[in-house]
């Protein structure tokens, strides 16, 4: 057996159980430039488009259930109350609420007056009244399509840095992955889920509990986006709180080697932070590399030339077009016209691809 010297994880058995026989076309939050993000409508859209993976995010509620949301605080740009009014910013913390309380809100229509976020993602959305789904509802939706090859790449959103405003209400990573694991096993999805996180402690806990579940190590070094967007912190004296106790300096600042040390199956960096050398090194360690979040054709082609195994995009229809032009094998779409979340695969092409400072992926 081969062990990680840092974590005593048997990395010879922590291989990706997910079997990707096609390019991993990932619809970010279900495809937030075309359907309301992290809703059953966007997830159904991704399936019917022919995405390999539904990329999505999850939070743990006060009553111990997992719901699908990127932000731990309800996003005022997309959330309306029972009276149809957009909520106040920073008012509702999902981690301090029950599922019943959350189901009173609607997240299907973006506020057209919210500014840049609407310009980037809202203008091209088809909108629907939509509630925040639970992880179980996502699993049930996937099962309703009958396609046993659909993958869910699901992110835990933790803030392990004590200086972060969101730190104090973090769930316990061990408890979170236990609940996640129970749901995945309940729906027999072990070979069709990936757990991804910037908080590598979550990934460590997942591998300890169930090494059959694939994990993906996210990272970013974008100080202009804010302190929480610096996960590696290569040049600081203290170890980064994002890496689960690992010191990146022990790996010469190399996140590929560091991710391999915790038994990660996939590495997922921000797309401007990788090179052909990173791709080749990941492959030499039997790891896949799937950058995020890529929304224009030029960058997609650049990454494909490097040899990446997948791409996460807000514009999955555009990524599909790019891949088809290159004759890259894709997943076959599955259509379910009887699904209440079936909306077809129409899209609009009117929004810019990135914010002025390039940080649309960080919203």
Regions of interest found by a model, annotated:
Residues 1-363:
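Phosphate-group recognition and catalysis centered on beta-loop-alpha active-site segments
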């Amino acid at each position: 057996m081969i062990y990680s010297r840092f974590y005593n994880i048997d990395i010879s058995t922590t291989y990706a159980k997910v079997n990707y026989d096609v390019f991993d076309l990932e619809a970010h939050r279900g495809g937030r430039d075309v359907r309301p993000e992290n809703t059953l409508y966007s997830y159904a859209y991704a399936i019917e488009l022919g995405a390999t993976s539904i990329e999505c995010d999850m939070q743990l509620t006060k009553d111990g259930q997992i719901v699908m949301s990127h932000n731990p605080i309800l996003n005022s740009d997309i959330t309306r109350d029972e009276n149809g009014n957009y909520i106040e910013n920073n008012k509702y913390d999902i981690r301090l609420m029950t599922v019943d309380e959350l189901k009173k809100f609607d997240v299907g229509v973006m506020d057209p007056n919210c500014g840049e976020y609407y310009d980037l993602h809202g203008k091209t959305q088809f909108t629907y009244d939509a509630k925040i789904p639970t992880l179980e509802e996502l699993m049930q939706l996937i099962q309703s399509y009958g396609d046993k090859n659909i993958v869910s790449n699901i992110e835990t959103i933790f803030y392990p840095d004590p200086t972060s405003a969101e730190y104090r209400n973090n769930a316990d990573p061990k408890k979170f992955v236990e609940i996640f694991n129970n749901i995945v096993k309940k729906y027999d999805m072990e070979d069709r889920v990936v757990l991804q996180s910037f908080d590598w402690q979550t990934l460590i806990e997942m591998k300890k509990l169930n090494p059959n579940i694939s994990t993906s190590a996210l990272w970013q070094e974008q100080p202009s986006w804010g302190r929480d967007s610096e996960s590696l912190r290569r040049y600081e004296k203290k170890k980064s709180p994002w890496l689960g106790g690992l010191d990146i300096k022990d790996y010469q600042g190399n996140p590929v080697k560091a991710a391999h040390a915790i038994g990660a199956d996939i590495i997922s960096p921000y797309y401007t932070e990788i090179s052909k050398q990173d791709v080749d090194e990941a492959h030499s360690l039997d790891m896949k590399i799937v950058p995020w979040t890529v929304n224009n054709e030029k960058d997609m082609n650049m990454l494909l030339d490097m040899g990446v195994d997948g791409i996460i995009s807000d514009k999955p229809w555009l990524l599909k077009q790019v891949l088809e032009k290159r004759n890259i094998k894709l997943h076959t779409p599955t259509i379910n016209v009887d699904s209440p979340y079936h909306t077809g695969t129409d899209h609009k092409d009117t929004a810019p691809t990135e914010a002025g400072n390039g940080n649309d992926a960080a919203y």
